[in-house]
Amino acid sequence: MTDKIRTVQGKVVSDKMDKSFVVAIERTVKHPLYGKFIRRTTKLHVHDENNEAKLGDVVEIKECRPVSKTKSHTLVRVVEKAVA
């Protein structure tokens, strides 16, 4: 298989778990009737083996095989550190 692995960027909204965190991915969708663009947010649980990502960081994640019941993404890199 030569499918491209899907990577997305998002902001870390929770890092209270060990070796994992929650990232919020924001997208805009057009309202079907009125045409106004609306912001929609998707929250994903991400596996972080070395606990690199912290609250507020912008991170790049990729899809992988399921690590647990809710985690099916892994951390690729921290794009931007949060200002503390």
UniProtKB/Swiss-Prot annotation:
Q: Does the keyword RNA-binding apply?
A: yes
Under CDD domains, the record lists: Ribosomal_uS17
**Cellular component terms (Gene Ontology):** cytosolic small ribosomal subunit
Give the domain of life.
Answer: Bacteria
Example GO molecular function term? rRNA binding
> Is Iron there in the keyword field?
no
PROSITE patterns referenced in this protein's UniProt entry, alphabetically: RIBOSOMAL_S17
Picking any one GO biological process from the record gives:
translation
Keywords, comma-separated and alphabetical: Ribonucleoprotein, Ribosomal protein, RNA-binding, rRNA-binding
- Oligomer status and interactors: Part of the 30S ribosomal subunit.
Function, please?
One of the primary rRNA binding proteins, it binds specifically to the 5'-end of 16S ribosomal RNA.
Report the family membership. Belongs to the universal ribosomal protein uS17 family.
Q: What is this protein called?
A: Small ribosomal subunit protein uS17
Organism equals Actinobacillus pleuropneumoniae serotype 5b (strain L20)
